[in-house]
Amino acid sequence: MKSFLLLNGPNLNLLGKRETNIYGENTLEHIEKGLIEIAKKNKVELMTFQSNAEHELVDRIQAGKEEKVSCILFNPGAFTHTSVALRDAILGVDIPLIEIHISNIFNRESLREKSYFSDIAVGIISGFGEQGYKAALELSLIHI
């Protein structure tokens, strides 16, 4: 059975509570439940993990190699623009990556336009709200 790892970075635990005009009204837990149902229907495992701590995300990425994860679906949050450590962790495990952003990072403040992951990702989904998570999972089922 294929397994996929959904990772969410800092502040995504506040979905549904923080800047709902940008990030929507649904919680991360609600989004994850919907994705787990899609995974079950497609006979794949979806593991989920969120952390505000960079080192915990690095550890989870590295554990994915041992678990033989087929693909990482990753919304790095603010780490998108700052984390060489997470980039190196992904390169180190050689697992395909799909980068996800709820908002369009290229249509926001200039500090959000640089991503440390886009050039190593299979694809990027940005600006489609929580539907971007569903699109990432469905596309990974086809392409990975």
Describe each model-derived feature in a short phrase.
Residues 51-94:
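N-terminal small/polar loop signature for handling phosphorylated ligands or for N-terminal nucleophile
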Residues 79, 84-135:
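Flexible, gly/pro- and Lys/Arg-enriched active-site loops
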Residues 38-49:
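Short beta-strand elements in bilobed, periplasmic/extracellular small-molecule ligand-binding domains
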